[in-house]
Amino acid sequence: AVARACNMTPSAVSKLISRLEKRLGVRLLNRSTRQFQLTSEGCQFYEQGIQILNGLDELEQSVTANHIPKGRIRIHTSFSYWTHFLLPCISLFNQRYQEIELEAHLSDEVINLVEQRIDVAIRTGPLKSSNLVARSLGSTYKQYVCSPLYIEKYGCPEHPDELHEHQLLDVSYQRQNKTWLFKKATQEVSLTPSKVLKVNHGEAILQLALAGAGIAQLNEFQIRNALQQKQLVKILEDWNIHASEEFHAVWIGHDKYVPNRVRTFLDFLVEHASIN
């Protein structure tokens, strides 16, 4: 992929990297017959190099005559955020910033921004990586829901312990079953589901819930219309834990040295694609 992007042969790229490693006196890549993986020194070199290049890009943009942001932005986001927030305003962005080319990669998994060469990623929950800069896009609440059809067939649980007898829906990219949390006044219940149908993104879980396939834990913005149209109903409302889930746009580098095209995209997200 690197060779194609640079219009070079793989062997030529490999030789350049080997020369760089020799000059630095450290190994930047771990090599195998099928893939390359960055070492910790390689990650550090890449991340600091990105900061330097971003600073040069910002300098170049600041001295050009028109200051028009341009170039490609590789973004990574979940299907849910793309569907409910980015997709409705992407045409406006393309119309407003015609010199910027967006390349979107959609999945609900947390990926390595360095390895996947991602400029901006949308992430939910606590931020674990200290080398990422973040900008808040707001927060939402999760609700436990199912369809009236499901209740008609299997009944409605009135206590979290009864969920062991029900079909639950959850994401599949976690190795272990996620703990579901419930709170009622001073009582707290944690449940690790045993009977779970798993799929790999939140919008598929929504569709399964609408089809009566089980009980799901979904973001409020995903189910708003379905609740209004009575396609879904909330369950265990007295037990729902009202903890918010934060959304952030994250990138590698320093907040001071962000390429003009990336800063433009971040500003657009805050204005048009924040969680309300």
Q: Where do the language-model regions lie?
A:
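A short LG(V/I)-centered, amphipathic sequence patch enriched
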Residues: 21-38
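Conserved amphipathic alpha-helical core elements
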Residues: 20-21, 232
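Acidic, Gly/Pro-rich loop/turn segments at junctions of secondary structure
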Residues: 105-199
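Alpha-helical linker/hinge and terminal dimerization helices associated
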Residues: 23-24, 45-67
